[in-house]
């Protein structure tokens, strides 16, 4: 009987947990704070973002600091440069901002360095190599920029916080950036991989031996990373 009661208590505790998510509406210049609980979802707050009320500034990338105290938003449509804005998760008020590159997009904070890494997508610019902005989120200062490929997007940090990855959409490359040295450590030419693949072979053996899929040890073991 005791075990049964404990099971009920644990089950009720798990089911009553609440989860929160921030969702950016790029064409509306707003960010919604949503709450998930049980089978329900509710919008708790709708936050107006941007500086110019007559212009759409395009909230694009959004991420929450690993400590859960702050959230960060990239405003992509700049004149010409975009901005990174820091907010409090407690009050959803602005705590600071800094200017980044052309069309700053997706980003994440490294648990190892504490820096924020944001790709500058450069959606409306010429098809030339763009950059990753490295920001100190404490002082909201852009420390440096790292040149990668054309129209980088999809910024992700490895679970150990040591590497940042992004895909250059127009140059067809995957870039690995060393989060400590702040330099490109390896690249993978995705387009050549696709071109060289023999599409006439459909066996599962061929799938198992595809370049770049030899281990599940992360991208460090991928063939073709230079």
Tell where the protein language model's regions lie, with residue ranges.
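Sec-dependent N-terminal signal peptides
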Residues: 2-13
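Predominantly soluble domains enriched in secretory-pathway, periplasmic, or organellar proteins
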Residues: 16-226
């Amino acid at each position: 009987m005791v075990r049964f009661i404990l099971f009920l208590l644990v089950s009720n505790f798990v089911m009553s947990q609440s989860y929160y998510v921030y969702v950016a509406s790029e064409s509306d210049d707003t960010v919604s704070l949503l709450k998930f609980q049980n089978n329900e979802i509710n919008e708790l707050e709708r936050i107006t973002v941007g500086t110019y009320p007559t212009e759409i500034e395009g909230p694009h990338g959004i991420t929450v600091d690993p400590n859960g105290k702050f959230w960060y938003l990239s405003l992509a449509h700049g004149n010409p440069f975009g901005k990174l804005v820091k907010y409090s998760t407690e009050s959803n008020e602005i705590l600071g901002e800094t200017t980044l590159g052309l069309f700053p997009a997706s980003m994440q904070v490294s648990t190892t360095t504490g820096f924020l890494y944001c790709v500058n997508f450069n959606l409306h610019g010429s098809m030339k190599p763009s950059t990753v902005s490295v920001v100190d989120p404490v002082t909201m200062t852009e420390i440096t920029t790292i040149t990668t490929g054309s129209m980088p997007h999809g910024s992700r940090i490895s679970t150990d916080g040591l590497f940042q990855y992004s895909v250059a959409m127009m140059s067809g490359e995957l870039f690995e950036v060393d989060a400590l040295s702040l330099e490109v450590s390896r690249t993978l030419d995705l387009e050549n991989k696709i071109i060289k693949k023999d599409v006439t072979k459909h066996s599962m053996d061929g799938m198992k031996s595809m370049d770049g899929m030899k281990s599940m040890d992360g991208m460090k073991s991928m063939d073709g990373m230079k």
